[in-house]
């Protein structure tokens, strides 16, 4: 059976991610490998029970949108002023859009907002002019947290699903992404293979979950 187009976009983006964000990889320690029965694995939007945890999950599939205003409070003077409010159809679109604004590339930011395809948003994000890896390394985790908090706090079904994972360790089972994912498939992780990735997406989701549970 052929892969779903959205899943293929997700896999292609993973391959680029590890190549482009090596400094982000080096600045976050590799965590120990937890027992698989303590984990909730997710990956592509159409695979498994928790595909909506993927940044490629989008509104035309899961029927959600979320808005973000500002973010200048977490990114110093780099954000547009006065802050504007934007509605996003996927977390990937939101992160890439904020990345473009952070670098002052409003042309690419506009292109990102014109597509509902998270794979295309990711590709536009790779073309941001004036990109500064050091600035992005410092801000990417903050941007990801703000985006994911908005996504899950503004959508009751999403929030319920996230809180429903209780205290389990959330892990993006991406075989090719050793930064935002664990660098393994769920099947490999369940066989006890040591994680190769930093799992920044899973760790960020757990921070959001803790905040929303209060």
Regions found by a protein language model. Give the residues of each.
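Charged, low-complexity intrinsically disordered segments
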Residues: 2-214
């Amino acid at each position: 059976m052929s892969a779903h187009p959205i899943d293929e976009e997700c896999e292609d983006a993973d391959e680029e991610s590890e190549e482009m964000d090596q400094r982000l990889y080096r600045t976050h320690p590799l965590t120990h490998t937890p027992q698989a029965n303590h984990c909730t694995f997710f990956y592509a939007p159409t695979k498994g029970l928790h595909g909506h945890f993927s940044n490629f999950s989008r509104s035309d599939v899961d029927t959600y949108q979320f808005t973000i205003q500002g973010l200048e409070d977490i990114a110093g003077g780099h954000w547009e002023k006065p802050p504007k409010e934007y509605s996003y159809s996927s977390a990937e679109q939101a992160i890439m859009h904020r990345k473009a604004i952070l670098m002052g590339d409003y042309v690419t930011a506009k292109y990102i907002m014109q597509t509902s395809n998270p794979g295309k948003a990711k590709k536009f994000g790779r073309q941001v002019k004036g990109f500064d890896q050091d600035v992005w390394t410092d801000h990417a985790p903050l941007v990801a947290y703000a985006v994911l908090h908005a996504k899950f706090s503004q959508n009751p079904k999403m929030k319920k699903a996230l809180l429903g994972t209780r205290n389990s360790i959330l892990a993006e089972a991406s075989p090719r992404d050793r930064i935002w994912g664990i660098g393994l498939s769920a099947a490999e992780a369940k066989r006890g293979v040591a994680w190769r990735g930093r799992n920044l997406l899973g760790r960020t989701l757990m921070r959001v979950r803790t905040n929303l549970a209060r």
